[in-house]
Structure formats: C-alpha cells, structure tokens
C-alpha cells in the first residue's frame, strides 16, 4: 500500500507553495488534483504552477488536455492511480495538491466510477436532464435527485448542475443510488493536510489574486479561449473564463466581469471548505496566519511515514 499525501483546502490558501516545500523536504513528486489545470494554454486563470515555482520538483496531470477535450473524475482517477504507483516505484512520495473535492474522493474512497467513455444511453440521459435544467432550472433538477437519493443530494450543491446530472445518470444507468455506488478496497494510505484561514483573510487574497491575474494577462487568455468557441467547450466552464465571455460580447463592462470572477471564486472557496470539512480525517492548519505551522506539518508527516 502506497503512502500518499493530499493537500486540500480552498482556492488561494497556499496549497501549491506548500506542496513544493513538502516535495523538497520528503523527496516528493506533485500530482495536480485540479480539474482545470489539465488544459493546455490556460495558465493564468487556472493559477497553474509556473516552471519557476516547480523548480526541480516533478509535476503531473498538468497540460495533458486540449481545450475541446472533456476531462472527468473517472479519467482523473485512472491517471492519478497510475502516477501514484509510478512515483512510489521510484521511492518518491506522491503529493496531491488541488481543490477539486470529488476528484480527491475518487482516490481516498477508491470509488468505482467505471469507464470514462460515453455511450449513447449516457448521452441521452445527460441531454434529457440538461434540457430539463434549461427549462425548469437547476433547483428543480436538484429536487428530482433529492426525491431519488437524499443522501447524494445533501452532498451536492443545488448550483452544481453538472454533478447533479451526473448523479441522476448513474442512478438511471445502474438502478442503484448514487450514494451507494460501490467502493473498491483501499489500495493507498492517504494523509490529508487541510489548509484554511479566516474567511476575511481568504476573501481578500482571492480578490487580490484575481486583480493580479488581470494584470498578468487573463483578459488575453480568456479572449483566445472565447475565439476558439470557448462558450461551448469543456474548458470554457472554468471560473475566470466564462465570466468574461459576456464582456467580449459587449453585454457587460470589464469591471462587472472582474467582480463576477471574484464573486464566483469566493463562492467556490466556500463550497471547497464545506466539502473538505466534511472529511473527518483531514488535519487542519492555518499557515497564512501561523507560518510556523509548516514545521508542525513536517513533523506530523515524519511521524506518519514511520508508521
């Protein structure tokens, strides 16, 4: 059984920097657990780690998809499991860094997601619920899931229509509750390090980071994606991109678009915190207000590795 560290928490809390520090300390390699950093050419809006930040630390599952490709939790699990085994075979420590909670859960709970390939039945089910969502709204679709599987609906925000539809797909295809999907026996031993901080501190960091993204060229990056038909592409759904599309169409001002990015980022951070705080085995630290906690984290990992 491989030992794996996962650094979790909301956006802008310092996961990338900590993952690199720990990789240096424990001879580790980093696996991105972010659903948007897989896309090539989308660097600024995804807060992708830079080559300068990486230094000599190997990073995986970054820049592996074109913008028109669909990247799913099933595909992530398959690739991440492969990388974990490869890294462990090199006698290095796999370190997962990222904020996509369900992606991490596929690994920690070893979820049986099945094939990543679409079939016609899946597409038909998905398109049906998409049409229902467009006609009656996201809350109505969530209520249908709530009637069928209250446990699953309690874990999925009403606003996350994509995951709600995914749950309805699974129920329809398998005849089983989404919350009762089978788990395989755990193959890896995970240590979850959670990063958090006071909400005003976090929100201020998010707002400043969005401003810095704009300064660093987010507008140009998003415009390129828009010109590639980004509104209809999987990569175009990401925060930092879809909020700018109405601006490019001349429907809102740049200030309004930027404020929407900040708002969506703050809401996303809140959802991330809620998700990870429900993981009872996460060990929480606030290295933004208490930088010396990094030493405590290192000692904590040292003790865990010896077990």
UniProtKB/Swiss-Prot annotation:
Binding site for substrate: 11-16
Positions of region (Interaction with substrate tRNA): 34-37
Cofactor(s) needed for function: Mg(2+)
Binding-site list for ATP: 9-16
InterPro entries the UniProt entry points to: Dimethylallyltransferase, IPT, P-loop_NTPase
GO biological process assignments: tRNA modification
Keyword terms, alphabetized: ATP-binding, Magnesium, Nucleotide-binding, Transferase, tRNA processing
An MF annotation (GO) of this entry: ATP binding
Pfam families for the chain: IPPT (PF01715)
Site (Interaction with substrate tRNA): 100, 126
Subunit structure: Monomer.
Its biological purpose: Catalyzes the transfer of a dimethylallyl group onto the adenine at position 37 in tRNAs that read codons beginning with uridine, leading to the formation of N6-(dimethylallyl)adenosine (i(6)A).
Similarity remark: Belongs to the IPP transferase family.
Listed HAMAP family: IPP_trans
PANTHER family reported for this sequence: TRNA DIMETHYLALLYLTRANSFERASE
Name this polypeptide is given: tRNA dimethylallyltransferase
């Amino acid at each position: 059984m491989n030992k794996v560290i996962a650094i979790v928490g909301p956006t802008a809390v310092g996961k990338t920097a900590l993952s690199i520090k720990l990789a240096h300390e424990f001879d580790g390699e980093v696996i991105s657990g972010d659903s948007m950093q897989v896309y090539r050419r989308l660097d600024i809006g995804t807060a992708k780690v830079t080559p300068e930040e990486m230094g000599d630390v190997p990073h995986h599952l970054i820049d592996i998809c074109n913008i028109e490709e669909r990247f799913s939790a099933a595909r992530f699990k398959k690739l991440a499991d492969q990388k974990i085994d490869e890294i462990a075979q090199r006698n290095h420590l796999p370190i997962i860094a990222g904020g996509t909670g369900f992606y991490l859960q596929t690994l920690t709970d070893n979820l049986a997601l099945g094939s990543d390939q679409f079939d016609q039945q899946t597409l038909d089910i998905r398109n049906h619920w998409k049409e229902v969502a467009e006609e009656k709204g996201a809350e109505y679709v969530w209520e249908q899931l709530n009637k069928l599987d209250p446990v699953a609906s309690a874990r999925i925000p009403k606003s996350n229509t994509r995951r709600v539809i995914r749950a309805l797909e699974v129920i329809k295809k398998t005849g089983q509750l989404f919350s009762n999907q089978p788990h395989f026996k755990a193959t890896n031993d995970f240590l979850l390090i959670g990063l958090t901080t006071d909400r005003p501190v976090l929100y201020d960091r998010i707002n400043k980071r969005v401003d810095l993204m704009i300064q660093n060229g987010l507008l140009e990056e998003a415009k390129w994606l828009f010109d590639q038909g980004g509104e209809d592409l999987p990569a175009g759904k990401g925060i930092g991109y879809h909020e700018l599309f109405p601006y490019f169409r001349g429907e809102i001002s740049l200030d309004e678009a930027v404020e929407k990015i900040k708002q969506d980022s703050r809401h996303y951070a809140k959802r991330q915190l809620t998700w990870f705080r429900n993981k009872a085995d996460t060990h929480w630290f606030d290295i933004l207000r208490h930088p010396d906690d990094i030493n405590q984290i290192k000692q904590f990992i040292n003790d865990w590795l010896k077990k």
